[in-house]
Amino acid sequence: MSQHRQKRVMLPLLLAALVLLLAAFFLWNRPSRLNRILYQEGYTITGCTEQSLSVAIPKKLLPDGFPQEAEAFEASDDLGLLLWSDGSSNLYLDALCYANGRTPDLLWASFHFQYEPSSRGSLLLPYLPDGQGGSTQSLGLSSTEAEVDCSPWPDAVHMAGQGPDEIFSVYLDAAAFQAASESFTFQVDDLWEVSYQPT
């Protein structure tokens, strides 16, 4: 094959490769659909409704003997423990361990929301978006009571912190958690169901 002919064949191949690389670059750096919804880039937020969510931690998801025999239980990114889902919003338990290293009467639990937004619908957010990418964090607990195997347990859960973004954490009474044979349930308030549609 002559050199001139090789150049004619290579030039379109190089251009095609360049186009593919540029397309991959722009797709990779494109903001996620969640961010586009929150910034109202191609989407309009049509409503925000305050909601509450009952969070249940099934004991069968945890390792045997936890928390009595375990130092800590942490879910890695590939082992997130899904606690709740409505199809587009998912709540995961990320970590559950003794508070402050080894306080035997208090547990610390960390959760995060993860989203799979469709082209239109609603999401359950732990903050109120302002439509320009900012938000007001307002997550709270209206009651410190937990439900331990369908029985109320007073003063068993307290808010530990919120943020960044879709993360929040709570303190749990270790005795109440250990008393649960099936599940430990508490209610999180001041969540926001945000409805959106394409513009």
Give the ranges of each region predicted by the language model:
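N-terminal Lys/Arg-rich, disordered targeting/topogenic segments
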Residues: 1-9
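Conserved functional micro-motifs across diverse proteins
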Residues: 8-199
